[in-house]
């Protein structure tokens, strides 16, 4: 009987990908970056389906989420970025959003990459960060027992303004599962303190992971 009471608390995370990847050769370092408004990318079908990243074209299995999960991701990213790169000059918020909206509406025929490049150029930034949420499924239940665990998929890109190159990519795709289902996930188990986490908590874990390889300053 006691074993049955303990099992719901032994939880880890099942994941497909959890990485931050510096793409080009050589060291990438910026002093001033702009953070464009993060976006939720949802499939046309309400039950979910495949979508493509607006920047790199990679395919993700996505589901639409209520609320504004893109704002959650952007907030957590900015908080962690300030902690990890305190000397980095970051432009964010309405200042960037206003420029982004204007350039997007005035330039309907250009690609998303070109829009971001123009945004960065106008703001005097060397790089522009863009983030996309593909899945933000909240847990159904409470911290010690759930009907359905939290599941999160997101991707963050860093674009170099001078040539439009995507110089860094951080991707996170994770669904929490019991430790009994996957005994190799002790690290996630201890990070989550042996409980079923919320989608925001899982997103925070992902942001922390991908920012480990985010380019530094010159």
Regions found by a protein language model. Give the residues of each.
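Sec-dependent bacterial lipoprotein signal peptides
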Residues: 1-13
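General secretory precursor processing signal
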Residues: 7, 16, 56-59
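C-terminal/domain-edge helix-coil "capping" segments
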Residues: 13-45, 119-123, 146-153, 157-218
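Short structured motifs
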Residues: 19-20, 114-116, 139-140
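N-terminal segment of the mature soluble domain
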Residues: 39-134, 161, 165-169, 200-214
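Extracytoplasmic/secreted cell-surface and envelope-processing proteins
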Residues: 45, 138-143
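Short low-complexity, flexible loop/linker segments enriched in glycine and/or proline
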Residues: 105-106, 144-147
């Amino acid at each position: 009987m006691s074993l049955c009471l303990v099992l719901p608390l032994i939880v880890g995370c099942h994941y497909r990908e959890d990485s931050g990847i510096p793409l080009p050769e050589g060291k990438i370092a910026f002093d001033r970056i702009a953070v464009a408004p993060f976006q939720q990318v949802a499939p046309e079908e309400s039950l979910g389906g495949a979508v493509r990243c607006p920047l790199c074209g990679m395919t993700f299995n996505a589901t639409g989420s209520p609320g504004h999960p893109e704002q959650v991701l952007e907030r957590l990213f900015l908080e962690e970025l300030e902690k990890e790169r305190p000397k980095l000059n970051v432009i964010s918020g309405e200042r960037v959003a206003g420029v982004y909206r204007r350039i997007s509406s005035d330039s309907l025929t250009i690609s998303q990459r070109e829009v971001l490049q123009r945004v960065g150029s106008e703001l005097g930034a060397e790089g522009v960060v863009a983030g996309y949420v593909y899945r933000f499924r909240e847990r159904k239940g409470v911290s010690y027992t759930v009907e359905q665990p939290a599941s999160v998929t997101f991707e963050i890109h860093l674009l170099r303004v001078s040539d439009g190159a995507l110089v860094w990519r951080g991707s996170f795709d994770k669904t929490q599962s019991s430790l009994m289902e996957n005994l190799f996930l002790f690290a996630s188990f201890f990070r989550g303190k042996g409980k079923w986490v919320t989608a925001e908590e899982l997103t925070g874990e992902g942001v922390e992971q991908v920012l480990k390889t985010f380019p530094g300053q010159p």
